[in-house]
UniProtKB/Swiss-Prot annotation:
Negatively regulates transcription of bacterial ribonucleotide reductase nrd genes and operons by binding to NrdR-boxes. One of its GO terms (biological process) is negative regulation of DNA-templated transcription. Transmembrane segments: none annotated. Binds 1 zinc ion. A zinc finger (unnamed) spans 3-34. It comes from Paramagnetospirillum magneticum (strain ATCC 700264 / AMB-1) (Magnetospirillum magneticum). The gene is nrdR2. This is Transcriptional repressor NrdR 2. Residues 49-139 form the ATP-cone domain. PROSITE patterns: ATP_CONE. Its cofactor is Zn(2+).
Amino acid sequence: MRCPFCGQDDTQVKDSRPTDDNAAIRRRRACPGCGSRFTTFERVQIRDLVVVKKDGSRSTFDREKVVKSLQIALRKRPVEDDQIERIANGIYRRLESLGENEVPSKLIGELVMDVLMEMDQVAYLRYASVYRNFREAKDFGDFLGKMGTSSGD
């Protein structure tokens, strides 16, 4: 595997082990060229999922987009990176279990929101503000009002 820091082609695997949910192999690697260490994940890909966007365009499902959006929503929250990886794996497995080759982007967003609602309401609000395209403070207030009534408060 190529080193992401210096670009050298040959890196050494120092440690391999399954992730907690057994959905991937975590490999610690070292670059003999620059001495950097980094982690890679190896996953089985059964088929390519295609995401159908709101405008009708299609693109291959990118698990890293889910991870990055979770990282942004959970920034400075008490959540470890491995938890974020497990959440992304769970969302991917749920999408694959549908048995469809194409999934609407709306479904992915809703799955992320469902997980965040249960896990961390601050992260849920952060994600919702982008996903639901909040434009002004009133949008937050309206959404918080709906959150309060839907959670039985």
